A protein has these predicted regions:
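Non-catalytic tandem-repeat scaffold regions and their flanking low-complexity/translocation tails
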Residues: 15-128
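Sec-dependent bacterial lipoprotein signal peptides
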Residues: 1-17
């Protein structure tokens, strides 16, 4: 069951940004301000599962924008270890593809599952 949940969350992180229509930032908000505001909103959610899912989405969006600071804050705030590891894995790979290798490595090191952490670090090292 945990295995399937990981893939569902990973799929949502990859698909959700493509589902957004139009301008993602509200009027008057820059990308970084919007990400910080979204992080604060997600962190304020009381339902743990919903909070973790929202933080995972914000982490993925922050990684796509190259904002490793927000990525790390989101990942540190996720309570479920599997969700945390999946968000860190996806974000690390996205940061690496955005040529943010050092930040990607720092995020990959946040993964607690050794096999998953090694896989992320290998992808970063190989440039995958």
């Amino acid at each position: 069951m945990k295995y399937y949940l990981r893939w569902i969350i990973l799929g949502a992180l990859l698909i959700l940004p493509a589902c957004k229509g139009g301008d993602s930032d509200p009027p008057g908000m820059s990308g970084k301000a919007s990400l910080s505001s979204r992080y604060e909103a997600a962190k304020a959610i009381t339902n743990t599962a919903q909070r973790d899912q929202s933080l995972s989405v914000v982490a993925g969006d922050a990684a796509r924008e190259g904002d490793a600071t927000v990525v790390k804050k989101c990942i540190q705030s996720i309570t479920a270890s599997a969700a945390k590891d999946d968000a860190a894995f996806t974000s690390a790979v996205v940061l690496a593809k955005a040529e943010k290798g050092q930040e990607a490595t720092e995020v990959a090191r946040m993964i607690t599952n050794t096999a998953q952490r090694d896989e992320a670090l290998a992808k970063i090292a190989k440039g995958d």
